[in-house]
């Protein structure tokens, strides 16, 4: 039976206004829109009155419910029947944890009530199209129609393909029907294999074969034999990549054989809790570094949010499934798309060439995709610290003559680093009889065909199959699985995981055969033991679906009870679905139908399928030199600063958490003005050291339209000039991931790919001492469609994205582009040696040209010398600022440095050649360094020692003020105010934020950027930052216990424990499941801290599901009430913990006036480094800090304080319960965005109780307790940041 329960309003006023404006633009007479959430409960038994009241209370979250009966035509948008939304999975979990076992499933829709003039059926279809994502949602016209969401179908049996009766044609038909993308020789191979077995294949076997042997999974092109211009080539592409490892194996521990590569890290204190006692402590051991970069291009073109989200999620799983289990740490993300054509902000180079119906626009991808990727990383608890963004779409005369080149099939890049224990780097052995386990969520009928689908050019497969390729994301589930993996590797030698792989393309049909085959075993499986939420799925759908957030593991049979215990504690679902066999055979039994859908020798599936040969021709580009007529430097500057590749990326940065883990030493945002221009990302290796890891990206795809090899060399060169900004040491410490994107089969591109791989793998990397131990290829970068009567194709340029990773010697020595105005000199190191080529530059692109000669690596020895010289200068602390030259050239390098330093530039380019345009806009490799004037001679001497004397040019100095002036020989070449340039550079991000977020907030942020008087972030402390007020109490040896409380989805508990640990506490890991099961109580604790993250993915209001699981459980409710009423206890709630505790007001004495915390005014997750002021309040944790003003990490989507009315706010203020407020850079309490990131009245962001014993706050002091983890800080701070005082105050209070 289904019950319907009304929910809160679903859209804010500005969202409704945006919809109305869109309808108006489409000439649809829509007058009013009201939207509210509607909940549907599928019940297995009726609820009594108390249970019904409990369910109603559970589903009461967010803004107050509307009291009126909605008017207008109903359009009900729900998830597509046959799918289960991530919201449903998490909300159902909460209902069960609150004791409502009668609820089979909760689901949520949005009911739109629309009052409109007379609309035709076709116009109503336009209206419904605007209101839902056809790939993931459906529209009903009555609330009762939602019954279809819970319809169950009978299981269907496996289907056989009549090969023996119909011969080869049966396989050809199945290939088309199932979208298998099998090549002719593979069809021959299967015909031969099954004829020899003497039986017909089942559909599931063919599907499994297609997934396991797709280009996506088998990399046939990279392993192929090559004939170019009639000449047999000596090596495959993959062999040339492996050559880098053969020449430079230094520091690599694992390459080419696992889900990620591993290199040597540093010996540090890894901080985690003991399995038996729950007590956190440091464990001195090597933290080796793993690295992986994936792409998720096809799903992102179809449905950008889930496409990018599952792209990030899959890459995170690759890291966790490395060796015998590892810890993902920090992420990077990247996008290449066609032109944005932002409405009202179209640029002169952006022509509309049309697109296929089945894919979305570049603007849609960049509106939704980055949000999906960021949301997954945020909810999982991984900071996203690095990225790139390129737009390209043009009709150009390239290798194949004049044609359309661009990214209708986008690149969505997801990568990152993690850490792994030394003894877990290599996978273990799978014993015969080992249990084969699926860890993670249930099978669902989604993402079918992803591996094969992404191996086809968009437009080759059936549109319905594209629907089937869409996936769905549940990062909170992945976090639970990762917590299990963490518990396993933390056990050291007792780790129950023998072998682990993630489940990705092809689902279990790819993952399980890979697992047993890699372990040298076969496997026998039971289909019906696989967890499934949809009983009507066929065997093919159960075995081959790509439901995300799953891992496959081999666990020794005697270790299963331990593994079961770990999973139950973390509430991570798992199922034992088979066991390893001696015989290399794969069998899958179906208990329901008592048959064998799969019964195959492993070598049929994974054996020597036919090897591909690529017989291709070389084509050379004949570009025309750049036509200069009508190009002025002033116009060029504005155009180039508007090009999204160059323009400010704030809209892509502040949506992503950049402080979680407490180990982020360098994020994108630089300096007191928080400008997104960092050269590279840097993390600390642990919470107790200055060793670290660095990541940087290099990418110059448009150059490939002129010169394939140069484009590849420049990608490596740019990654190197980016990562050089931190202290690494020997270049052999740097390892690269190479991600290759090409339109295989397009004239000239295959030979170009070979040329590019050879340039990097056989020549450049070996010469530099660089290794490429990991990478990926995507070989179908083309879209085809019909535009009117014309057949069109959009082919991406050959695109190599290089991600560089390295161990860092001292994270404190990372140099940023932030200029200083002390007596200084700016030096350009021009590795282009005066070539100043303008082919395929940003300048060429904004004038709709390609040019003829591009930049290149001009001298490999000098590139190596450059890296070594910069490393020497970093170690000697001779550099004040550093920024590489890249897209937009020297002009953009100097501008970005000036933006970061909020200063002027007085530059002279006389020594850079007579062609001023080329001097300013060429994109040859190089960098601008800022040094003290007194150090200039010594710095130039170091550069000369490294063979760079002929590359160094003095180009002026940074000056105070707002003028950006470039001269040559006394003549002004360009002059503008820095503020004007800053505003031009920011306009793309402003327009994107206006479209995507609350336009009022976007306008406020843009306005703030034009304020030259803004002093930037600054610090005023009312206490001595270096005084340790806890020291006398620590000296007694007593370590009071703090319960570090977490719920499923919480992700900030480790850094919280570390902060309390440093202040003299014993931090104990306490999971809500421990309290609910009675394994642990709160009576033995002096302090309770509820940590940040996304409990239950924030589905029933941030922190509200967590709070209700306490309030609706009598024993646990009493446990909390007793703790809060006990004198001499302290409690702290941060972020999600703050939201949760604000919902426990009925249990906490003196908290009656506390507000609720609701959706930010921007309607967006906000990750900022915000200035706050400590106000006079009873808070015991903030004693002695009153009046201090200092920055703090902020990361939340629902942090806005909501009070009932003005009287409530006045009472909260007059009682003095406000503990922290947001202030602007002038020190004034503010409600202006983004200084106030959530729109809270009077800047309120922390409150306390009347006794001061319980304090709750939205910002994260635990993420910045170390100076090094602050995005910016005064140079005189030592090891401890000012927020360490909170934790020491806690220790002092307990005496």
UniProtKB/Swiss-Prot annotation:
InterPro entries, per the entry = Class_I_gatase-like, FGAR-AT_N, FGAR-AT_PurM_N-like, PurL_large, PurL_linker, PurM-like_C_dom, PurM-like_C_sf, PurM-like_N_sf
Q: Where is the active site?
A: 1135, 1260, 1262
Q: Tell me the Pfam families matching this sequence.
A: AIRS_C, FGAR-AT_linker, FGAR-AT_N, FGAR-AT_PurM_N-like, GATase_5
Region (Disordered): which ranges? 305-327
What's any GO biological process attached to this entry? 'de novo' IMP biosynthetic process
The pathway this protein participates in, as annotated, is: Purine metabolism; IMP biosynthesis via de novo pathway; 5-amino-1-(5-phospho-D-ribosyl)imidazole from N(2)-formyl-N(1)-(5-phospho-D-ribosyl)glycinamide: step 1/2
Please name the PANTHER family in this protein's record. PHOSPHORIBOSYLFORMYLGLYCINAMIDINE SYNTHASE
Subunit and interaction comment: Monomer.
What is the official name of this protein in its record?
A: Phosphoribosylformylglycinamidine synthase
- Taxonomy of the source species: Bacteria, Pseudomonadati, Pseudomonadota, Gammaproteobacteria, Enterobacterales
């Amino acid at each position: 039976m289904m019950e319907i329960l009304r929910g809160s309003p679903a859209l804010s006023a500005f969202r409704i206004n945006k919809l109305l404006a869109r309808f108006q633009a489409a000439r649809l007479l829509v007058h009013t829109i009201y939207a509210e959430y509607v909940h549907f409960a599928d019940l297995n038994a009726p609820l009594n009155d108390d249970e019904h009241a409990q369910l109603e209370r559970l589903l009461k979250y967010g803004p107050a419910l509307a009291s009126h009966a909605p008017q207008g035509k109903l359009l009900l948008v729900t998830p597509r029947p046959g799918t289960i939304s991530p919201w449903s999975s998490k909300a159902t979990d909460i209902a069960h944890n609150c004791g409502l076992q009668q609820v089979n499933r909760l689901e949520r829709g949005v009911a739109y009530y629309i009052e409109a003039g007379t609309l035709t059926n076709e116009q109503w279809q336009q209206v419904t199209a605007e209101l839902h994502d056809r790939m993931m949602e459906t529209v009903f016209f009555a609330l009762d129609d939602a019954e279809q969401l819970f319809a169950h179908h009978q299981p269907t049996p496996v289907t056989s393909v009549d090969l023996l009766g119909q011969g080869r044609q049966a396989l050809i038909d199945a290939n088309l029907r199932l979208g298998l993308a099998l090549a002719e020789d593979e069809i021959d191979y299967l015909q031969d294999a099954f004829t020899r077995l003497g039986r017909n294949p089942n559909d599931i076997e063919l599907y499994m074969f297609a997934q396991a042997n797709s280009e996506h999974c088998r990399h046939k092109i990279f392993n192929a034999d090559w004939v170019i211009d009639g000449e047999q080539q000596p090596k495959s592409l993959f062999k040339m990549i492996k050559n880098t490892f053969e020449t430079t194996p230094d520091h690599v521990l694992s390459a080419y054989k696992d889900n990620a590569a591993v290199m040597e890290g540093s010996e540090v204190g890894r901080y985690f809790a003991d399995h038996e006692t729950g007590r956190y402590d440091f464990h001195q051991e090597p933290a080796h570094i793993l690295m992986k970069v994936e792409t998720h291009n096809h799903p992102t073109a179809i449905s950008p949010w889930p496409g990018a989200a599952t792209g990030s999620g899959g890459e995170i799983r690759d890291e966790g499934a490395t060796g015998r289990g590892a810890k993902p740490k920090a992420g990077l993300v990247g996008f290449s798309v066609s032109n944005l054509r932002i409405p009202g902000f179209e640029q002169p180079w952006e022509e509309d060439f049309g697109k296929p119906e089945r894919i979305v626009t570049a603007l849609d991808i960049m509106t939704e995709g980055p949000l999906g990727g960021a949301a997954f990383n945020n909810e999982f608890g991984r900071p996203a610290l690095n990225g790139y963004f390129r737009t390209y779409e043009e009709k150009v005369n390239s290798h194949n003559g004049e044609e359309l080149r661009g990214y209708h099939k986008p690149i969505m890049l997801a990568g990152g680093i993690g850490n792994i224990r030394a003894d877990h780097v290599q996978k273990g052995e799978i014993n015969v009889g080992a249990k084969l386990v699926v860890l993670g969520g249930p099978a669902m009928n989604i993402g079918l065909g992803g591996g094969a689908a992404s191996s086809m050019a968009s437009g080759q497969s059936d549109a319905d199959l594209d629907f089937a390729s869409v996936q769905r994301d549940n990062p909170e589930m992945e976090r639970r699985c990762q917590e299990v993996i963490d518990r396993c590797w933390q056990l050291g030698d007792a780790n129950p995981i023998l072998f682990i792989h993630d489940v990705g393309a092809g689902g279990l049909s790819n993952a399980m055969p890979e697992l047993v085959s890699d372990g040298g075993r076969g496997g026998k499986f039971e289909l019906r033991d696989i967890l499934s939420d949809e009983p009507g799925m066929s065997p093919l759908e159960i075995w081959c679906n790509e439901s995300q957030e799953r891992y496959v593991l081999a666990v020794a049979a005697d270790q299963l009870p331990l593994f079961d215990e770990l999973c139950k504690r973390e509430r991570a679902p798992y199922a034992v679905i088979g066991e390893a066999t001696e015989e290399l055979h794969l069998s899958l039994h179906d208990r329901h139908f008592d048959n064998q859908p799969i019964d195959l020798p492993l070598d049929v599936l994974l054996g020597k399928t036919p090897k591909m040969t690529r017989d291709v021709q070389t084509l050379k580009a004949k570009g025309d030199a750049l036509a200069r007529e009508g190009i002025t430097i002033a116009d060029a500057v504005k155009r180039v600063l508007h090009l999204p590749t160059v323009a400010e990326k704030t809209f892509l940065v502040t949506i992503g958490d950049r402080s979680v883990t407490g180990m982020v030493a360098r994020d994108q945002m630089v300096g007191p003005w928080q400008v997104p221009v960092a050269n590279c990302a840097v993390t600390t290796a642990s919470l107790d050291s200055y060793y670290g890891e660095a990541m940087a990206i290099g990418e110059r795809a448009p150059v490939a339209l002129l010169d394939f090899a140069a484009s590849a060399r420049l990608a490596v060169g740019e990654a190197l000039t980016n990562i050089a900004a931190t202290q690494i040491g020997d270049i052999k410490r740097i390892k690269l991931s190479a991600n290759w994107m090409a339109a295989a089969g397009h004239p000239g591109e295959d030979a170009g790919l070979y040329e590019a791989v050879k340039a990097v793998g056989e020549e450049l990397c070996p010469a530099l001492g660089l290794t490429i131990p990991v990478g990926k290829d995507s070989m179908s970068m083309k879209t085809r469609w019909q535009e009117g009567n014309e057949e069109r194709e959009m082919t991406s340029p050959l695109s190599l994205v290089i991600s560089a990773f390295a161990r860092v010697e001292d994270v404190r020595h990372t140099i940023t582009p932030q200029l200083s105005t002390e007596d200084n000199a700016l030096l350009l190191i021009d590795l282009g040696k005066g070539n100043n080529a303008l082919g395929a530059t940003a300048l060429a692109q904004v004038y709709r040209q390609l040019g003829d000669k591009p930049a290149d690596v001009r001298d490999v020895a000098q590139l190596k010398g450059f890296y070594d010289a910069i490393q020497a200068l970093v170690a000697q602390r001779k550099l004040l600022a550093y920024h590489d030259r890249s897209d937009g050239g020297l002009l953009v390098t100097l501008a970005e440095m000036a933006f970061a330093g909020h200063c002027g530039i007085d530059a002279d380019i006389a020594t850079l050649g007579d062609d001023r345009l080329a001097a300013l806009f060429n994109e040859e490799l190089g960098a601008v360094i800022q040094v003290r004037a007194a150090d200039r001679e010594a710095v130039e001497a170091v550069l000369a020692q490294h063979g760079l004397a002929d590359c160094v040019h003095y180009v002026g100095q940074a000056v105070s003020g707002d003028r950006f002036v470039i001269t040559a020989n006394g003549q002004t070449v360009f002059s503008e105010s820095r503020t004007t340039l800053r505003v031009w550079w920011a306009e793309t991000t402003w327009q994107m934020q206006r479209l995507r977020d609350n336009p009022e907030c976007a306008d406020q942020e843009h306005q703030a950027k034009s304020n030259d008087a803004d002093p930037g972030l600054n610090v005023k402390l009312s206490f001595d930052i270096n005084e340790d007020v806890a020291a006398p109490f620590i000296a007694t040896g007593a370590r009071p216990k703090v319960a570090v409380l977490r719920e499923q989805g919480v992700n900030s508990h480790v850094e919280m424990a570390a902060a309390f640990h440093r202040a003299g506490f014993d931090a104990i890991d306490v999971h809500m499941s421990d309290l609910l099961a009675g394994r642990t109580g709160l009576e033995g604790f002096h302090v309770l801290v509820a940590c940040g993250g996304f409990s239950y993915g924030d589905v029933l209001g941030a922190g509200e599901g967590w709070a209700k699981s306490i309030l609706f459980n009598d024993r646990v409710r009493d446990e909390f009430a007793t703790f809060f009423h006990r004198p001499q206890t302290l409690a702290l709630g941060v972020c999600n913990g703050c939201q949760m505790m604000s919902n426990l007001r009925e249990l906490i004495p003196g908290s009656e006036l506390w507000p609720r915390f609701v959706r930010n005014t921007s309607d967006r997750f906000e990750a900022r480094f915000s200035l706050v002021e400590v106000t006079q309040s009873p808070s015991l944790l903030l004693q002695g800090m009153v009046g201090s003003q200092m920055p703090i990490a902020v990361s939340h989507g629902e942090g806005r304080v909501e009070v009932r009315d003005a009287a409530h706010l006045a009472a909260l203020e007059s009682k003095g319960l406000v503990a922290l407020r947001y202030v602007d850079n002038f020190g004034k309490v503010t409600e202006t965005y983004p200084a106030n990131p959530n729109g809270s009245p009077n800047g309120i962001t922390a409150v306390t109780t009347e006794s001061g014993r319980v304090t709750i706050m939205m910002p994260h002091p635990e993420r910045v307790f170390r100076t090094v983890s602050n995005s910016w800080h005064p140079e005189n701070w030592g090891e401890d940041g000012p927020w360490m005082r909170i934790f020491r105050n806690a220790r002092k209070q307990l005496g």
